[in-house]
Amino acid sequence: MLNIRQERIKEYVEKNNVATIRELQVLFPKVSLMTIHRDLDALESKGVLVKFRGGARSVRHTGDPEFDVRMRENNGGKRVIADKAMSLLQPHTSIFLDASTTNLILAKNLPDINLNIITTGPNIAIELCRLHNPVVTLCCGLINRKNLAVSGQNTLEMLEKMNIDMAFIGVSGCSVDAGFTCGTEADMLVKRLAIQKAHTSVVMCGSDKFNCLMPYTFAKLPDVDYVVTEGNVPDAFRGAAEKAGVKLL
C-alpha cells in the first residue's frame, strides 16, 4: 500500500509522464533527497514507474525520458535565449541549428521567412515543416536516441559541403578555461565543424551552464562571435569574452 506522499508522486508522474528529482523536491520541500529516492525505488518495485538518472517516468510513457527532462530544465530561460538568438536572423541566409533543446524551442517559434536551414535534429526538421518559406535540410547520420541528434562520419562529410552564414549551437557546459563543452565526442565533432564552417557562430548558453564542465570542448571563446544567455554572466567570463571580442546578448 502506498503512503500519501508516494500516492502524490504516482499521480504527478501519471499526469506529466515524466518527473524530475528537482520537480519532486519542489513538490515536497520538507522531504530529503534520500527519502524521495526511496519513494521512487518503492514505486518502481510496485511497477508504478521507471526510474532513470535524474527522475522517473510513467510506465506508459514511450518517449525518451532524458530528452524530456532536458526540455523541461530552465524552459523559460531557453525561450528567452531563443528569442534573443532569433533577433540575429536575416532573411535569405543559410543557418545551422544543432540538435539542442534551445534550438527546438527556436524552431517552434521561428517566423515563416526565407531561410536555408541545416539541422542535425530530426525533431527540429519536423517542427520546421509547419513553415512554408524555409528550405530545410536534415543531415544524414546515426541517430542518438538520448538526445535525438544525428552524428557520425556521414554527418561530418555532409556538413563539410555546406556553406553556412550563421550557426546556432547549444552547450552543456561553459567556462573561461575549458571553453564550450558537451557530453559526447560525436556531438563535439559536429558542433566544432559547424562553427568552423559558419561565417558567424552563436553559442546559446543558459545561466545554469556557466562554470559547468563536460568531457569534450568544441570551441573556445575566440572561436565564436556571440554568446546568448538569459541570466547573469559571471564577471570572469564577461571579462574574457570582451577581451576575445565576443558579443554577449
Feature roles, as predicted:
Residues 101, 122-123, 232:
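Alpha-helix/helix-capping structural signal
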Residues 7-11:
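Pre-recognition alpha-helix immediately N-terminal to the DNA-recognition helix
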Residues 23, 126-249:
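Conserved phosphate- and dinucleotide-binding cores of soluble alpha/beta proteins
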Residues 97-98, 119, 229:
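Short beta-strand scaffold positions
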